[in-house]
Amino acid sequence: MKKMLIGGIRLYQKYISRFTPATCRFYPTCSAYGIEAIETHGALKGSYLAIKRISKCHPFHKGGLDFVPPKKE
């Protein structure tokens, strides 16, 4: 499941994102954040974190640095 989700993000990065203007308000970008979140926290929680992050990416949010939280042991 993780590989499939990450593969979808990579397809977006390669075939869609590169043809649109850079508008991400965050560092790392939302797609890079999504990949890291899924790799760190697994498919379910990583997807939740990625969707939560993407929902904040709009003109009324100031953006900035927003890193994937570390996995709790």
Swiss-Prot record:
Annotated membrane topology: Peripheral membrane protein
GO cellular component: plasma membrane
Record flagged with keyword Lipid metabolism: no
UniProt cross-references to SMART domains, sorted A to Z: Haemolytic
UniProt entry keywords in alphabetical sequence: Cell membrane, Membrane
A Pfam family recorded for this sequence: YidD
Signal peptide feature range: none
InterPro entries: Membr_insert_effic_factor_YidD
Compartments where found: Cell membrane
Role noted for this protein: Could be involved in insertion of integral membrane proteins into the membrane.
Alphabetical list of NCBIfam families matching this protein: membrane protein insertion efficiency factor YidD
Family: Belongs to the UPF0161 family.
Family annotation (HAMAP family): UPF0161_YidD
PANTHER family assigned: MEMBRANE PROTEIN INSERTION EFFICIENCY FACTOR-RELATED
Protein name: Putative membrane protein insertion efficiency factor
Organism lineage: Bacteria, Bacillati, Bacillota, Bacilli, Bacillales
